[in-house]
Design a protein with these regions (language model features):
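Secondary-structure edge/capping motif, primarily at the C-terminal ends of alpha-helices
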Residues: 14-25, 43-47, 70-74
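Short, charge-rich amphipathic interface segments used for partner binding and complex assembly
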Residues: 32-68
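N-terminal acidic leader/helix
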Residues: 1-32
Length: 74
């Protein structure tokens, strides 16, 4: 069974990153990105369910895109 709350936390973290980017706040956006990435790695270490792995890989793609945006802000 997928741990929905964990993914909700990740979604909230991603939303915070997006808000920081919207406010041109590269420093906080980057710090939050590191935090969310670590949470994602943690999840990855503790799952072997296909559904969760698919969800995690979506977040990884999203975080990579956000990282590019943060870099372009700096």
């Amino acid at each position: 069974i997928m741990d929905i709350t964990k993914f909700d936390e990740l979604k909230n973290g991603v939303q915070e990153i997006i808000d920081f980017i919207g406010n041109k706040n590269a420093k906080d956006a980057n710090n939050k990105l590191v935090e969310v990435s670590e949470e994602l790695d943690e999840l990855l270490d503790h799952t072997d369910e296909d559904e969760e792995l698919r969800e995690i890989s979506k977040f990884q793609v999203l975080l990579n895109q956000l990282q590019q945006k943060i870099i372009s802000l700096q």
